[in-house]
Amino acid sequence: MQLKHLKKGDFVKVISGREKGKTGKVLTVISEKNRVVIEKMNMVKRHQKANAMGKGGIVEKEGPIHASNVMMMCGKCNKETRVGIKKLEDGKKVRICKKCNDILDI
């Protein structure tokens, strides 16, 4: 299943879980698992093995969050919103805010 409502660079708000209420920027979309990685959210510790470029140790990095636990933030009305798809006159599909009908794609 492909995530059509979230893309890299979108601003989202976490609506459930440990990080509830926080907002951040989407770094990666993992559409096969229906998950997103958000900047400075769901920090997990990973044990890094040493390699030729650097030393090993315990590294803290962002972990994935399920896409159902986040909502898109509209840039115009500054509210979390559901995302709709609208077809323009030239045939191009764009994402729109369901609350203010503003185009979310840049």
UniProtKB/Swiss-Prot annotation:
One of its GO terms (biological process) is translation. PROSITE patterns: RIBOSOMAL_L24 (PS01108). InterPro entries: KOW, Rib_uL2_dom2, Ribosomal_uL24, Ribosomal_uL24_CS, Ribosomal_uL24_KOW, Translation_prot_SH3-like_sf. Keywords: Ribonucleoprotein, Ribosomal protein, RNA-binding, rRNA-binding. Pfam families: KOW, ribosomal_L24. SUPFAM superfamilies: Translation proteins SH3-like domain. GO terms for cellular component: ribonucleoprotein complex; ribosome. GO terms for molecular function: rRNA binding; structural constituent of ribosome. One of two assembly initiator proteins, it binds directly to the 5'-end of the 23S rRNA, where it nucleates assembly of the 50S subunit. One of the proteins that surrounds the polypeptide exit tunnel on the outside of the subunit. Belongs to the universal ribosomal protein uL24 family. Part of the 50S ribosomal subunit. This is Large ribosomal subunit protein uL24. The gene is rplX.
